[in-house]
Amino acid sequence: MRAGVFTALAVGLLCVSTTAESVPQRGSHVDRVLVLKKERTLELLSRGKVMKVYKVALGGDPVGPKTKQGDHKTPEGVYVLDFRNAHSQFYKSIHISYPSQRDRAVARRKGISPGGDVFVHGLPNGFGAVGAAHRLKDWTDGCIAVTNQEMDEIWQAVPDGTEIEIRP
């Protein structure tokens, strides 16, 4: 993304710790992902029980739901993590099924494009060393960003087809 942002954030790298919960065990069944935008968290759930919580960075203008392409907002609603990209420009990424039919209908009524290409992803390639410091500022175009190590954990724990709910 923006090289200057990541260079500045690298300074705070050693001052920011990761979440305390343990890594979800291989074979644990994550059946839902919950993102709380206000808290800047992503939770992995199994049968309603929180298995792991990650701190995240969101779109650069995160307050309110995504309504149009280029608004730098992270969508709000219930979607599906429907496919993954192991060769993403952001380390690894898992696609969020935004826009839904409802999102498209609202955008159509307004005569605008709802946008798309919203993912849960790691850090931009070449900036993995920034680590947890990336969370000091919301910086994505509307995606949900975690560290590369956290993305590896999510990648292993969350199967394609898992529901993701994104709340304000």
Predicted regions and their residues:
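Exported/periplasmic cell-wall-interacting domains
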Residues: 25-28, 83-168
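N-terminal targeting signals for Sec/Tat export/insertion, comprising classic cleavable signal peptides
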Residues: 28-52
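Surface loops and adjacent helix of pleckstrin homology
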Residues: 38, 45-47, 56, 84, ...
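Well-ordered beta-strand positions in beta-sheet-rich domains
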Residues: 32, 53-55, 78, 117, ...
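Bacterial N-terminal signal peptides that target proteins for export
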Residues: 1-6
